[in-house]
């Protein structure tokens, strides 16, 4: 069992080097694969001897035991990547994960905010304080660009061009994209860079665009906490909140105003159009609600 766990660590190291996956993803893979190794060990199996039927039984057992479909899908992804790696490294002569059936995932619509709610959220920070001026600029950039939370906290000074009005983003899989900022975001970035950021840095030299109060790179958890703080001030229902609430609003509002789906896909940094298409369902649902509220025969 120790040898199998060691191979998992080798695999995760290789995955980090090749794919530049987030630490949270790697830790989730580590937990899932360690659980799988223990499950195999109790059945007298190892990574070298496990067969497709064994892996399928593991997935089925997880689902029947109350595992969420999304968790099972993540487990399947980890298992597939691991055995592809073992096959590529010639530890195995076959890949038993090649034909595993995927669990059916329920289609969940992203939590979205109305344009009026977003406006209230953006107006919540008190811009006469450097810290809240930073937060105002962050919220404006999030809504203007649709960036992921992890992408925003990773931005550096060299990633933005206020003259050109664009931001350079390094997204999932280390893929780079340029996203327009828009006039409002550019204005608040300029204001923050002049009146907010120098106060936050207090003489510390750091390239991070949005530093923490301690002049370090902000964590995703801190940003999420700040979003929730302003949402409460704006009177927004907590059930409508998620770390990517402004990303979802960005996509939905663009589609509501007639944006092309593939343009939205490019701006969001989605590799698969089907990932973007879920926002069309949000827009359609919004239209249906408006129809029911205002049409005399609805």
From Swiss-Prot:
Q: Which UniProt keywords apply?
A: Cell cycle, Cell division, Chromosome partition, Cytoplasm, DNA integration, DNA recombination, DNA-binding
A GO term for molecular function: tyrosine-based site-specific recombinase activity
Q: Can you say where in the cell this protein is located?
A: Cytoplasm
Q: Which PROSITE patterns match?
A: CB, TYR_RECOMBINASE
Gene Ontology cellular component terms for the protein in this record: cytoplasm
Indicate whether Transmembrane appears among the record's keywords: no
Known regulation of its activity is: FtsK may regulate the catalytic switch between XerC and XerD in the heterotetrameric complex during the two steps of the recombination process.
Which InterPro entries does this UniProt record tie to the protein?
CB (IPR044068), DNA_brk_join_enz (IPR011010), Integrase-like_cat_sf (IPR013762), Integrase_catalytic (IPR002104), Integrase_recombinase_N (IPR010998), Integrase_SAM-like_N (IPR004107), Recomb_XerD (IPR011932), Tyrosine_recombinase_XerC/XerD (IPR023009)
Report any Pfam family annotated for this entry: Phage_integrase
> Any idea what job this protein has?
Site-specific tyrosine recombinase, which acts by catalyzing the cutting and rejoining of the recombining DNA molecules. Binds cooperatively to specific DNA consensus sequences that are separated from XerC binding sites by a short central region, forming the heterotetrameric XerC-XerD complex that recombines DNA substrates. The complex is essential to convert dimers of the bacterial chromosome into monomers to permit their segregation at cell division. It also contributes to the segregational stability of plasmids. In the complex XerD specifically exchanges the bottom DNA strands.
Family designation: Belongs to the 'phage' integrase family. XerD subfamily.
Protein name stated in the entry: Tyrosine recombinase XerD
Native source organism of the sequence? Escherichia coli O157:H7
| Gene this protein is translated from | xerD
């Amino acid at each position: 069992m120790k040898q199998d766990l060691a191979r998992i660590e080798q695999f995760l190291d290789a995955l980090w080097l090749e794919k530049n996956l987030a630490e949270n993803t790697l830790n989730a893979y580590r937990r899932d694969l360690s659980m799988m190794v223990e499950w195999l060990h109790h059945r007298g199996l190892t990574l070298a001897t496990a067969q497709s039927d064994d892996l399928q039984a593991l997935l089925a057992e997880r689902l029947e035991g109350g595992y969420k479909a999304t968790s099972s899908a993540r487990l399947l992804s980890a298992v597939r990547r691991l055995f592809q790696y073992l096959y590529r490294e010639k530890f195995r002569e076959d890949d038993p994960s090649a034909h595993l059936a995927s669990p059916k995932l329920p289609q969940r619509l992203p939590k979205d905010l109305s344009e009026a709610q977003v406006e209230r959220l953006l107006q919540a920070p008190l811009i006469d304080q450097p810290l809240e001026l930073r937060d105002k600029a962050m919220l404006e950039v999030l809504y203007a660009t649709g960036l992921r939370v992890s992408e925003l906290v990773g931005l550096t000074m060299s990633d933005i061009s206020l003259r050109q009005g664009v931001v350079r983003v390094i997204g999932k899989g280390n893929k780079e994209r340029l996203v327009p900022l828009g006039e409002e975001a550019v204005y608040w970035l300029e204001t923050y860079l002049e009146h907010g950021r120098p106060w936050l840095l207090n003489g510390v030299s750091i390239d991070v665009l949005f530093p923490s109060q301690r002049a370090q790179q902000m964590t995703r958890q801190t940003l999420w906490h700040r979003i929730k703080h302003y949402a409460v001030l704006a009177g927004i229902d907590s059930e409508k909140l998620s770390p990517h609430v402004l990303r979802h609003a960005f996509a939905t509002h663009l589609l509501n105003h007639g944006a092309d789906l593939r343009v939205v896909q490019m701006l969001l940094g989605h590799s698969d159009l089907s990932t973007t298409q879920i926002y069309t369902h949000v827009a359609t649902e919004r239209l249906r609600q408006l129809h029911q509220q205002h049409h005399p025969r609805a």
